[in-house]
Regions:
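Conserved N-terminal phosphate-binding loop of PLP-dependent enzymes in the Aspartate aminotransferase
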Residues: 1-372
Length: 372
């Protein structure tokens, strides 16, 4: 039993020691097909040659310098992320939660006396203080109340509620294009378009949390692209640096004008090792976009017998009428790693390199898991 390292999640009864492609291997040498990919982080699978070469090559040269100095990879990475997102500036951080914190600071500086955030019921934006304030899940949020930040929560895809929530004191609308921890619930195209329209009309900022949906997961680089809208601020993290800690906040020049130097900083963020790996990941991710869309449809078809499939690309879920944990356990015992969120929703976040044969392999294991 682990007596010193405090778990921050309900641990599965397995310890992994290595990985290759879409498979993990445990201490006993047993292999598992992984459709969780480190909660969406290991998007290129395990031991990917480009990622390994970048890590080992850069580790021999320079790992860390701190925010006091530049490095040869930070500006090219910032430029590429800005080009991809349609935005102008990038601020590097260590995680999705820290990206939320920095985004909230950007909103505060831009909006001045207007402080209210409109966010979504069921949303998740990290476990830091600011992230909890805008997370629309009472079980996670309430234990740390009260919060100084005023937040109005609205039901996803309820356009009437969204319209009613806007007032002169609203500074921003914060959304996930697909609510990840909230059950993999996609926002409707018209809803995201209305959010953009309302923010523009009221002078508020549109803030897209793309930590789970972004960087290829849905079959497009960003989830907001499905609606053809342009956010003012975008947060990214999870797969950005191939398993190394790195996130970023992307924002417009208009927002940048209101953000003083040193308003947010991080000792480790944007270092040469993580930034070099991120450049390799983004190049490979763009090449894989057609494959993500194609194999995502194959995965959805394989999941269809078990319930109405939700999501896009390789971010999929099946809501059940029974608890999901027993299915997760049965699948794991049979060599397949999946995830359950919101107690009854099976979630699938496989590596982008998942093959059609592996989709069929997963389907066969799931069939056995459901028959137990």
């Amino acid at each position: 039993m682990n007596t010193h390292a405090l778990p921050n999640a309900r641990r599965q009864p397995v310890t992994f020691v290595s990985g290759e492609g879409c498979y993990l291997t445990d201490e006993a040498g047993r292999r598992y097909l992984d459709l969780v990919s480190g909660l969406g982080v290991n998007a290129l699978g395990y031991n990917h040659p480009r990622i390994i070469a970048a890590i080992t090559g850069q580790a021999r040269r320079l790992v860390h310098t701190s925010a006091l100095y530049g490095n040869e990879f930070q500006e090219p990475l910032a430029r590429l992320l800005c080009q991809m997102s349609g935005l102008d500036r990038a601020l590097f951080v260590n995680s999705g939660a820290e990206a939320t914190e920095a985004a909230l600071k950007l909103v505060r500086h831009f909006a001045g006396d207007r402080r209210r955030i409109v966010a979504l019921e069921g949303s998740f934006h990290g476990r830091t203080r600011g992230g909890m304030a805008v997370t629309g899940q009472p079980a996670l949020r309430d234990p740390f109340a009260p919060y100084s930040l005023p937040v109005s929560f609205v039901a996803p895809n309820d356009e009437a509620q969204l319209r009613a929530a806007f007032s002169p004191e609203v500074a921003a609308f914060l959304f996930e294009p697909i609510l990840g921890e909230g059950g993999v619930r996609p926002l409707e195209i018209s809803y995201m378009q209305l959010a953009r329209e309302l923010c523009t009309r009221h002078g508020a900022l549109l803030v897209a949390d793309e930590c789970q949906t972004g960087l290829g997961r849905t079959g497009k680089i960003f989830g907001f692209e499905w609606a053809g809208v342009q956010p003012d601020i975008v947060t990214v993290a999870k797969p950005l640096a191939g398993g190394l800690p790195l996130g970023a906040v992307l924002f417009s020049a208009a927002v940048a004008e209101h953000f003083p130097l040193t308003s947010h900083g991080s000792t480790f963020a944007g270092g040469p090792l993580a930034c070099r790996v991120a450049l390799e990941f983004l190049d490979e991710m763009q090449r894989l976009l057609p494959h993500i869309a194609e194999v995502g449809e194959a995965l959805a078809a394989e999941l269809a017998p078990y319930g109405p499939v939700r999501g896009r690309g390789l971010m999929r879920a099946v809501p059940l009428e029974i608890p999901g944990d027993p299915i997760v356990a049965a699948a794991r015992d049979a060599g397949l790693l999946i995830n359950c969120t919101q107690k009854t929703v099976l979630r699938f976040l496989p590596p982008y390199i998942l093959s059609a044969d592996q989709v069929r392999e997963a389907g066969g294991i799931l069939k056995r898991a459901f028959s137990r």
